[in-house]
Amino acid sequence: MAHITFDTKNIENFVAAHEFSEMQPLITMADEQLRHRTGAGAEYSDWITLPTDYDKAEFSRIQAAAKQIQSDSKILVVIGIGGSYLGAKMAVDFLNPMFNNELADDQRQGVKIYFAGNSTSASYLNDLVRVIGDQDFSVNVISKSGTTTEPSIAFRVFKQLLEKKYGAQAAKKRIYATTDAKHGALHDEAISEGYETFTIPDGVGGRFSVLTPVGLLPIAASGANIQDLMNGAKDAQEEYSESDLTKNEAYKYAAARRILYDKGYTTELLINWEPTMQYLSEWWKQLMGESEGKNQKGIYPSSANFSTDLHSLGQYIQEGRRDLFETVVKLDNPVSNLDLPHEAGNNDGLQYLEGITIDEVNTKASQGVTLAHVDGGVPNLAVHLPAQDAYTLGYMIYFFEMAVGASGYTFGINPFNQPGVEAYKTAMFALLGKPGYEEATKDFRARLGE
């Protein structure tokens, strides 16, 4: 099958060929730390071999659970936050039509997927409860600890809604818990109540977990082919098995990013030209930001959805500070296409476009914008996708994961932890009056003048 390709021709005005050769020793060192598990955080690097070394029996249970959900539910509510949310959301959006939840049942591959537990908004939860109404639904709650605030709140709400609708015993059969194999509040409740459970592997961090049960159950329930997803990742694992930058495009992406960073390009914009890829950017931002942003180092990950954001961010990208570069994820073959309709007269000025498809307009717009941005001093990298399908997605997931793993080690940091997130949690728990935070509560409330 066709693979994704990485294109560096639009950084040639910014990066000389010899700079990649000079980066090779640093990439080789990073590769050794990754593959030999000698780098910081190596205990969380099982994702490297995950496409070939995963629990096949559990994988079959996931497929069976997805079929069960499709047989007894119209809706699956997926409860999780961060890595327990973004990977599944990204994949479900990527692999299904834009308005999948609005399609009639016979026009969808699987059930409607809605996400909860990813914010503290009461309005969001109320609105989702109203959307569900009297439709049959199931819940997939995803949390390693079972005590993360946002998912725990949402789980209470939807668990009680299930119990009210189906009764306590029948509700238990509609709850699927993805959690720690041995410990934690959710694990203990799942065992006690008899929920079907799936395991979050100890050696895979949240932002790398989309190819584990964390992502696989929601993706399968949506009707996507998760075997194709894993096959794509498996082929990428084989393709990116060498450290040589002339043979490993994931590492070449990591090297290009690091070279640009060293030249002062400290912000990366991930660009897409398809609305179904908006959450690809959100997943990527967590993957890159949590992995690299440590010790006052790292590339700041941002994103833009083109052509929409050209009408808001286009001016800044063209003429603002020259500290950013773009990585464009471009789909070479759209899932569907549309001819521009003929219309008598030329009031809208579009007659010159008649006879071509709307995707051709999208492609030419992408090419033109790239040329303009490069001319304006913005280095441009490109990741080309041959198709918008499960195989390609699995391949691309592994591409970005390998790139950031290597990139993190080139910065001399641990790419697999996220110690900085504890600061906001401490402040939030203290202000909410959580037991054990009494001293911090006094301090933070005093600072707020309470």
UniProtKB/Swiss-Prot annotation:
Q: Which top-level group of life is the source organism from?
A: Bacteria
Q: Does the keyword RNA-binding apply?
A: no
Per the UniProt record, which residue ranges are transmembrane? none
Q: Which Pfam families match?
A: PGI
Q: Which GO terms describe its biological process?
A: gluconeogenesis; glucose 6-phosphate metabolic process; glycolytic process
Note the InterPro entries from the entry: G6P_Isomerase (IPR001672), Phosphoglucose_isomerase_CS (IPR018189), SIS_dom_sf (IPR046348), SIS_PGI_1 (IPR035476), SIS_PGI_2 (IPR035482)
Q: What is its EC number?
A: 5.3.1.9
- Reactions catalysed, as given in the entry: alpha-D-glucose 6-phosphate = beta-D-fructose 6-phosphate
- Which GO cellular component terms, listed alphabetically, does the Swiss-Prot or TrEMBL entry include? cytosol
Keyword terms, alphabetized: Cytoplasm, Gluconeogenesis, Glycolysis, Isomerase
Q: Which GO terms describe its molecular function?
A: carbohydrate derivative binding; glucose-6-phosphate isomerase activity; monosaccharide binding
Instruction: Look up the record and name the pathway of this protein.
Output: Carbohydrate biosynthesis; gluconeogenesis; Carbohydrate degradation; glycolysis; D-glyceraldehyde 3-phosphate and glycerone phosphate from D-glucose: step 2/4
Cited SUPFAM superfamilies? SIS domain
Cell membrane listed as a keyword: no
**Which CDD domains does this entry report, sorted A to Z?**
SIS_PGI_1, SIS_PGI_2
Q: What does this protein do?
A: Catalyzes the reversible isomerization of glucose-6-phosphate to fructose-6-phosphate.
Q: Which family does it belong to?
A: Belongs to the GPI family.
Q: What is this protein called?
A: Glucose-6-phosphate isomerase
Lineage of producing organism: Bacteria, Bacillati, Bacillota, Bacilli, Lactobacillales
